[in-house]
């Protein structure tokens, strides 16, 4: 239709421009009696040829429908040996009804997939797609960049419905998530759908509890921050948690209970799936839209864990508070005096402490933010807040009357619920 919109009248091809008949003319019968038809085409052959040519040229010059379609990206993270590559195989190589592209950013001896699919391309920072022959594509990236992935998508029009990005086992997924999480105005051809964290049920507690490098079973050089390991950050950023190798602990109900409690202390909002060989229905993992909307149930049913095990290094807290009175209170108080200081450079902690830093040096850092904010007024509205570390965005929400309180869930390190609640209380006084 966009091509036809630009078709113009040509008197030589189309003949005399006809008069418009509305049916309300006083001499309508006289007009109809003078209507003649020569038996030819209503639209001239020249006109048909010109329209067809213009449509062809427009189609050739315009961006392809497949290129315009935004492609979702799921980031798969977890330590080497946790089952990431097995999960990729389950999703991409065994019966998925999507045309999936797999991007590998980890080179490990245990991954036969990587050995089979990695191809070289000179000194380029990214490598070409490899067609696997079953509707899926694969490539390996050493220097991940959104532009590199967008270029690959553009060179494969119509071949990609979904992208799976496997990170290095020792990678913090937050910077990668922020890289993909772009403003709609940037018109990127890809967007982040969610982060899937794969855990090894048998070893994850050891990874979380023992921060010595020698204690880590996977053999990687573990990135440490204070007394936090990358496993803490991978869990905190997860939108879906795959508890893999469940068969190694299912014989011990106590171990299963302890594992659930520990994971929930760190991240209480991501759905958790216990698996063997990373086998779980695809609909549990793909097209979850974790970064562009929040299901109300995710917020209402989430909060800090209530188990007997507490990990004060990384955890989840939930704040509930009254609806905001108006847009002014939302913008000038909640956003500028609470949310932004909370997320930016630990100003929140310093504000609560009268402008000084904590004596123990353990200033909090929010890893993930999800919130539902209700704003009263003549026409009540709701806002959904999504955040990754110091970056956040706001989306329209639904104010259906069933929700009576604002709720915000924070996942991060060294979070002090009492201090953050105090900051919020002072802000909204």
Curated annotation (Swiss-Prot):
<keyword id="KW-0479">Metal-binding</keyword>
<feature type="binding site">
    <location>
        <position position="139"/>
    </location>
    <ligand>
        <name>Zn(2+)</name>
    </ligand>
</feature>
<dbReference type="Pfam" id="PF02492">
    <property type="entry name" value="cobW"/>
</dbReference>
<keyword id="KW-0547">Nucleotide-binding</keyword>
<feature type="short sequence motif" description="psi-PxLVp motif">
    <location>
        <begin position="15"/>
        <end position="22"/>
    </location>
</feature>
<dbReference type="GO" id="GO:0034224">
    <property type="term" value="P:cellular response to zinc ion starvation"/>
</dbReference>
<keyword id="KW-0342">GTP-binding</keyword>
<feature type="binding site">
    <location>
        <begin position="244"/>
        <end position="247"/>
    </location>
    <ligand>
        <name>GTP</name>
    </ligand>
</feature>
<comment type="function">
    <text>Zinc chaperone that directly transfers zinc cofactor to target metalloproteins, thereby activating them. Catalyzes zinc insertion into the active site of methionine aminopeptidase MAP1, which function to cleave the initiator methionine from polypeptides during or after protein translation. Mechanistically, the N-terminal psi-PxLVp motif binds to the C6H2-type zinc finger of inactive form of MAP1.</text>
</comment>
<dbReference type="InterPro" id="IPR036627">
    <property type="entry name" value="CobW-likC_sf"/>
</dbReference>
<dbReference type="InterPro" id="IPR003495">
    <property type="entry name" value="CobW/HypB/UreG_nucleotide-bd"/>
</dbReference>
<dbReference type="GO" id="GO:0051604">
    <property type="term" value="P:protein maturation"/>
</dbReference>
<dbReference type="Pfam" id="PF07683">
    <property type="entry name" value="CobW_C"/>
</dbReference>
<keyword id="KW-0862">Zinc</keyword>
<dbReference type="GO" id="GO:0005737">
    <property type="term" value="C:cytoplasm"/>
</dbReference>
<comment type="similarity">
    <text>Belongs to the SIMIBI class G3E GTPase family. ZNG1 subfamily.</text>
</comment>
<feature type="binding site">
    <location>
        <position position="138"/>
    </location>
    <ligand>
        <name>Zn(2+)</name>
    </ligand>
</feature>
<dbReference type="GO" id="GO:0140827">
    <property type="term" value="F:zinc chaperone activity"/>
</dbReference>
<feature type="binding site">
    <location>
        <position position="136"/>
    </location>
    <ligand>
        <name>Zn(2+)</name>
    </ligand>
</feature>
<protein>
    <recommendedName>
        <fullName>Zinc-regulated GTPase metalloprotein activator 1</fullName>
        <ecNumber>3.6.5.-</ecNumber>
    </recommendedName>
</protein>
<dbReference type="InterPro" id="IPR051316">
    <property type="entry name" value="Zinc-reg_GTPase_activator"/>
</dbReference>
<feature type="short sequence motif" description="CXCC motif">
    <location>
        <begin position="136"/>
        <end position="139"/>
    </location>
</feature>
<dbReference type="InterPro" id="IPR027417">
    <property type="entry name" value="P-loop_NTPase"/>
</dbReference>
<feature type="binding site">
    <location>
        <begin position="78"/>
        <end position="85"/>
    </location>
    <ligand>
        <name>GTP</name>
    </ligand>
</feature>
<dbReference type="GO" id="GO:0008047">
    <property type="term" value="F:enzyme activator activity"/>
</dbReference>
<dbReference type="InterPro" id="IPR011629">
    <property type="entry name" value="CobW-like_C"/>
</dbReference>
<dbReference type="GO" id="GO:0005525">
    <property type="term" value="F:GTP binding"/>
</dbReference>
<dbReference type="GO" id="GO:0003924">
    <property type="term" value="F:GTPase activity"/>
</dbReference>
<keyword id="KW-0378">Hydrolase</keyword>
<feature type="binding site">
    <location>
        <begin position="139"/>
        <end position="143"/>
    </location>
    <ligand>
        <name>GTP</name>
    </ligand>
</feature>
<feature type="domain" description="CobW C-terminal">
    <location>
        <begin position="362"/>
        <end position="428"/>
    </location>
</feature>
<dbReference type="GO" id="GO:0046872">
    <property type="term" value="F:metal ion binding"/>
</dbReference>
<keyword id="KW-0143">Chaperone</keyword>
